[in-house]
Regions:
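Sec-dependent N-terminal signal peptides
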Residues: 3-13
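C-terminal and inter-domain tail/linker signature
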Residues: 15-183
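Short, Lys/Arg-enriched, disordered terminal segments
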Residues: 1-3, 183
Length: 183
C-alpha cells in the first residue's frame, strides 16, 4: 500500500511540474530595455548592444520579411531618428510558449500601442502592435514586429497632409460616341 501511495505521489508531481518563469523574468528585462530604446529619448547604441549579430527579425515593413542585423538596425535607426515624443502604452507583457508543448520557453511577447510624432511633418500617429523576442546569451536573437508600419508612415508623411484637388468635370466626363464612330 505504501508503494502505491508513493507511486501516486511521484506520478502526480512528475506530471504537474510548475512552469519555471525565472528565464522569462530575466529575458523580460532585456525585452523591456529594447522597447524602451524606441521611446523618447531614443537610444540606438543601447539597442544595438541588445541585438545578437545573427538575429533573425520578422519586419513589420511591407515586403521585408525576415531580416538580419544590418536591416534591423537600419529600421530601428529610421524609427528612432524619424519620430519624437514616442511612447509605448497599454503594455501587456506575456511569457512565450513552446508551440509543441505549450510550456513557457523563456521567450517574451508584448501587445501595446505606439504613439508619437513625425519629426519631418509634425503629424502624430497611434498604432497597435505585437512584438515577440527570443533571447540567447543576453541578446535578442529572434524577434518580430506586427503592426501597420506602412500605414503609419503614410499617415504621417507630407503627402498625407495634402488634400486632393478638385478635377475639372469636363476632364472626367464620359464622351459621347455616335453609332457611326463605333463601327
Amino acid at each position: 500500500m505504501k508503494y502505491l501511495v508513493l507511486l501516486l505521489v511521484v506520478t502526480l508531481t512528475a506530471c504537474n511540474q510548475p512552469d519555471d518563469l525565472a528565464l522569462y523574468k530575466t529575458n523580460l528585462e532585456i525585452a523591456k530595455k529594447g522597447i524602451s530604446c524606441y521611446e523618447s529619448p531614443a537610444n540606438l547604441e543601447v539597442y544595438k548592444s541588445l541585438i545578437h549579430p545573427d538575429v533573425k527579425h520578422q519586419s513589420a515593413m511591407y515586403g521585408q520579411g525576415i531580416v538580419g542585423y544590418e536591416d534591423l538596425i537600419g529600421q530601428a535607426k529610421f524609427y528612432m531618428e524619424g519620430f519624437t515624443n514616442v511612447t509605448f502604452e497599454n503594455q501587456l507583457w506575456l511569457p512565450g510558449v513552446d508551440t509543441t508543448t505549450l510550456a513557457t520557453d523563456g521567450s517574451v511577447r508584448v501587445y501595446g500601442t505606439w504613439k508619437g510624432e513625425s519629426i519631418a511633418t509634425g503629424a502624430s500617429f497611434s498604432v497597435d502592435s505585437y512584438h515577440y523576442f527570443h533571447i540567447k546569451d543576453g541578446q535578442i536573437d529572434f524577434s518580430g514586429d506586427y503592426f501597420d508600419a506602412t500605414g503609419m508612415v503614410q499617415a504621417v508623411s507630407a503627402s498625407a497632409e495634402t488634400t486632393p484637388t478638385e478635377t475639372d468635370p469636363a476632364e472626367t466626363a464620359p464622351t459621347e460616341t455616335t453609332p457611326a464612330e463605333t463601327e
